[in-house]
Amino acid sequence: MSSAKLGSASEDVSRRDANYHPTVWGDFFLTHSSDFLENNDSILEKHEELKQEVRNLLVVETSDLPSKIQLTDDIIRLGVGYHFETEIKAQLEKLHDHQLHLNFDLLTTSVWFRLLRGHGFSISSDVFKRFKNTKGEFETEDARTLWCLYEATHLRVDGEDILEEAIQFSRKKLEALLPELSFPLNECVRDALHIPYHRNVQRLAARQYIPQYDAEPTKIESLSLFAKIDFNMLQALHQRELREASRWWKEFDFPSKLPYARDRIAEGYYWMMGAHFEPKFSLSRKFLNRIIGITSLIDDTYDVYGTLEEVTLFTEAVERWDIEAVKDIPKYMQVIYIGMLGIFEDFKDNLINARGKDYCIDYAIEVFKEIVRSYQREAEYFHTGYVPSYDEYMENSIISGGYKMFIILMLIGRGEFELKETLDWASTIPEMVKASSLIARYIDDLQTYKAEEERGETVSAVRCYMREYDVSEEEACKKMREMIEIEWKRLNKTTLEADEVSSSVVIPSLNFTRVLEVMYDKGDGYSDSQGVTKDRIAALLRHAIEI
């Protein structure tokens, strides 16, 4: 706790301090840019030539279905599948209808199953029954087969006992075999045991897989080179976007004006790029990066620095959504409020320029107001000493975790669908949005509740569950981890049941959940980004792949 005066606060008040570390990047992304494409028309020509070669490989008719399945999977895992969405969909439809899978071995069946389920095709897990022996047990010692089986099990839904058995079997075998494996299979297995592909940020997974694939004796040279060039080309685009975001952040001078808050514009960009990296979603990334930046400042103000009176004034100003309201909030908050209004006004202008209409901006503003209300409730928990029930806490945290907001804003930014109907549906917090939000909350609370308690907070999913069900801290944490698995199964199930409206929400729900899995796998990688988060950002946004 500290006595602090910021802005024009009229009196000293006791305020908390989370002691967040300063940015680990300084002005690096403000000045750095890739020279990969600079005066290099030959690279663009080579990229186009290789893309056509890969497309030809993908669409050519063949009776060798296992090879076609492996090629399709490699294209997706290498991060270049977005170039061939139509062709991949056509291939998967053929593979879904084909009965020759009865002749596939366990390795090919596992890849086939994961590919199809991962793209929304309903495939029964009974396809694995024929790989059990007379004792009802799986039996294989082949590491590559075990790796593929393990990856496939993470698309399981509730009640699939055979996949529950398969995940235990394959994990145990892989852990035992790992020390004996050599590159690149050892890294493939290690990565999967750490974060399986289905739960990994797809851009990060591609960065990991590109050198692994390149070392395979059976690699296709044109595909390997295409993946490297495409990664570096996309990285150059992402660097330009982050440079623009860093310039905006610096112009507002948020770090010096709000020293109690997290200075994490690069980490926020990594978050949004992880959710949708494709070039066509540049507008959405730009908007969402600024949104996560301003939301993070508001969150820290409500959680750490602001008094209850101050944050209540800010909440009221957000409800008014009027520049005149800035006069009614403390001076130190005004830069946040002005920045917030500016983001939405800029986004509105971009929507009009890009699509000729801006009706969706009302959805964006409303969902932003909703998250501020949820922050207000959490501030009231702390300042009044009110302890909510577990269900009450979770109901509010589904909103305060931000994933409903991010999913809806991402849908608006992407603009691919009949938006009004989709946004009306997503605003009701349907099952896939709820599952994604709950996974985010459980993961977040497991990694942050102790740090929050050190600064005086006593309300978290862990503590509320302990209090309500009279269990130990260890038991409550175990329950949270079990709930993460339950919600992942529910999320998987909703993707298989998606209709025309809900299918547009599948990818945002999955990708935002994946980002949380990765960002919080070794702690709160957003608040403390000095370790593995910094390394991952550097791999994606700083270091090009050698060609």
From Swiss-Prot:
Domain comment in the entry: The Asp-Asp-Xaa-Xaa-Asp/Glu (DDXXD/E) motif is important for the catalytic activity, presumably through binding to Mg(2+).
UniProt record, GO biological process: diterpenoid biosynthetic process; farnesyl diphosphate metabolic process; response to jasmonic acid; sesquiterpene biosynthetic process
Induction of expression: Up-regulated by methyl jasmonate.
Binding of Mg(2+) 3, residues: D444
The protein's role, per its UniProt record: Sesquiterpene synthase involved in the biosynthesis of delta-guaiene (78.2%) and alpha-guaiene (20.9%), two structures composed of five- and seven-membered rings. Also produces 0.9% of alpha-humulene.
Catalytic activity: (2E,6E)-farnesyl diphosphate = delta-guaiene + diphosphate; (2E,6E)-farnesyl diphosphate = alpha-guaiene + diphosphate
Residue sites binding Mg(2+) 2 per the record: D299, D303
SUPFAM superfamilies listed in its UniProt record: Terpenoid cyclases/Protein prenyltransferases, Terpenoid synthases
Cofactor: Mg(2+)
Sites where the protein binds Mg(2+) 1: D299, D303
GO molecular function, one term: sesquiterpene synthase activity
Gene: C4
Protein name: Delta-guaiene synthase 3
Species of provenance: Aquilaria crassna (Eagle wood)
Record's keyword terms, sorted: Lyase, Magnesium, Metal-binding
InterPro entries reported for this sequence: Isoprenoid_synthase_dom_sf, Terpene_cyclase-like_1_C, Terpene_cyclase_plant_C1, Terpene_synth_N, Terpene_synth_N_sf, Terpene_synthase-like, Terpene_synthase_metal-bd, Terpenoid_cyclase/PrenylTrfase
Family of this protein: Belongs to the terpene synthase family.
Pathway linked to the protein: Secondary metabolite biosynthesis; terpenoid biosynthesis
